[in-house]
Amino acid sequence: MACLSRIFLILMITMSSSSPPFCSGGSRKELRDKEITSKSDDTQASYVLGSKFVDPTRVLQLSWLPRVFLYRGFLSEEECDHLISLRKETTEVYSVDADGKTQLDPVVAGIEEKVSAWTFLPGENGGSIKVRSYTSEKSGKKLDYFGEEPSSVLHESLLATVVLYLSNTTQGGELLFPNSEMKPKNSCLEGGNILRPVKGNAILFFTRLLNASLDGKSTHLRCPVVKGELLVATKLIYAKKQARIEESGECSDEDENCGRWAKLGECKKNPVYMIGSPDYYGTCRKSCNAC
């Protein structure tokens, strides 16, 4: 009887070892499928948002007075093309969701995170990314990246500027710092400017010294675009947090008297309080039609 029991036990062990491990195999297959799905999701996220990591080997310090830095290949080809597809002349690049609210485009959000990582400045201190196009300009003008003529008013809280090149140009469009220590490229007539527009490159320059005082050497100008088209995105970074109500789609007044004040002309008489400034979020933006 003991012999039969021993034989039965041997048969059971043999059958167990020869049977295909359905559960084990299924688990491995399920795990493998999860890994493939995870990799696919990571690839998709990487394509949508782009790389948020900063590669210090691509960064060159071009000047200390003022502080000017060049990042080669800051944006990918896809990111440049995406910004171009979203652009509206002199306006922020946003998208609108199903509810009609204005939201920051995911690719733009990724770019802004990378800008913050590169500059070591909080993202909340930055203004919206703006995209502009320049073609066939008069060579006698001194231009900048914030309009047709160089701005004569410097925001008191402006700390730094990031210029993102979205295209190459056949001729022109270089960025110059006439008062900087960079030599000798101080003229649009000189060739070989390292700050010439190259698609994907980014330039960071500070308008303040390390002690927070204004850097007079940060005065800059842009060479006119003689041939081709220049597409460029700019982002201003301030010393203080910037209110960007557009992200939530809200537009409201903070005082019940705003409507009456607006009718009395206070929007023009007292624009800082009513509409706002880089340092102050306006109290009556809705009544002043500022949003």
From Swiss-Prot:
Assigned EC number: 1.14.11.2
Subcellular location: Endoplasmic reticulum membrane
Reactions catalysed according to its record: L-prolyl-[collagen] + 2-oxoglutarate + O2 = trans-4-hydroxy-L-prolyl-[collagen] + succinate + CO2
Membrane-topology descriptor: Single-pass type II membrane protein
Transmembrane segments: 157-173
Disulfide bonds: C251-C291, C258-C284, C267-C288
Domain of life: Eukaryota
Cytoplasmic side: 1-156
Residues carrying sugar: N211
Residue positions binding Fe cation: K142, D144, H220
UniProt cross-references to Gene3D superfamilies, sorted A to Z: q2cbj1_9rhob like domain
Lumenal face of the membrane: 174-291
Boundaries of every Fe2OG dioxygenase domain copy: 125-239
Function per UniProt: Catalyzes the post-translational formation of 4-hydroxyproline in -Xaa-Pro-Gly- sequences in proline-rich peptide sequences of plant glycoproteins and other proteins. Hydroxyprolines are important constituent of many plant cell wall glycoproteins such as extensins, hydroxyproline-rich glycoproteins, lectins and arabinogalactan proteins.
Stated name of the protein: Probable prolyl 4-hydroxylase 12
Organism listed in the record: Arabidopsis thaliana
